[in-house]
C-alpha cells in the first residue's frame, strides 16, 4: 500500500503585476534532511483526518500558516504517484492563496529555508519532474481563472 501525503501549493499575487504575468509567487520550503529538496508544505495523513485536513495541518506545522490565513482555490486538485525511500507514495496537492501578501512564514525543524518564487524560479528549485509539472499546471490554472 502506498504512503499517502497531502499538501498545499501556497501562492501569493504581487500587488503590482508585471506585464509578463509573473504576478504569482509560490512558497517553497527547503527540507533540513536528505538532499535538502524544495517542495510546498506536505505530510502524511493521520488516522481520522481527511486529505484536506492533513494539508492544512501540515501547512500550519511546517510553515506556520493557519487555515484562516488561506483561501483554498476550488477546482484544482492534483495527485502525484512516485517512489520515495523505495516505497510507493501518493501526494495530493491543492492550491491555496494567502490572504495577506506579507504573511509571516514560521518554519518547523523539518525545513531550513523558504522562498517565494515566480514559476520559472520555482521550477528550477523543484528538482523532481512531477513537482515541476504540478507547479506549471497550478500556474496555468490560476492564469486561466484570471482570463
From Swiss-Prot:
Cofactor note: Divalent metal ions.
Biological processes per GO annotation: AMP biosynthetic process; apoptotic process; ATP biosynthetic process
Co-factor(s): a divalent metal cation
Entry's Gene Ontology molecular function annotations: bis(5'-nucleosyl)-tetraphosphatase (asymmetrical) activity; GTP binding
Domain called Nudix hydrolase: residue spans: 2-139
Enzyme class, broadest EC rank: hydrolase
Residue pairs linked by disulfide bridges in the UniProt entry: none
EC number: 3.6.1.17
Record field: catalytic activity: P(1),P(4)-bis(5'-guanosyl) tetraphosphate + H2O = GMP + GTP + 2 H(+); a 5'-end CoA-ribonucleoside in mRNA + H2O = a 5'-end phospho-adenosine-phospho-ribonucleoside in mRNA + (R)-4'-phosphopantetheine + 2 H(+); a 5'-end FAD-phospho-ribonucleoside in mRNA + H2O = a 5'-end phospho-adenosine-phospho-ribonucleoside in mRNA + FMN + 2 H(+)
Pfam families: NUDIX (PF00293)
Placement of sequence motif Nudix box: 43-64
Keywords recorded for this protein, A-Z: Acetylation, GTP-binding, Hydrolase, Nucleotide-binding
Activity regulation info: Inhibited by fluoride ions.
N-acetylalanine PTM sites in chain numbering: 2
PANTHER family in the record: BIS(5'-NUCLEOSYL)-TETRAPHOSPHATASE [ASYMMETRICAL] (PTHR21340:SF0), DIADENOSINE 5,5-P1,P4-TETRAPHOSPHATE PYROPHOSPHOHYDROLASE MUTT (PTHR21340)
Function: Catalyzes the asymmetric hydrolysis of diadenosine 5',5'''-P1,P4-tetraphosphate (Ap4A) to yield AMP and ATP. Exhibits decapping activity towards FAD-capped RNAs and dpCoA-capped RNAs in vitro.
Family: Belongs to the Nudix hydrolase family.
Protein name: Bis(5'-nucleosyl)-tetraphosphatase [asymmetrical]
Source organism per UniProt: Sus scrofa
Classification of source organism: Eukaryota, Metazoa, Chordata, Craniata, Vertebrata
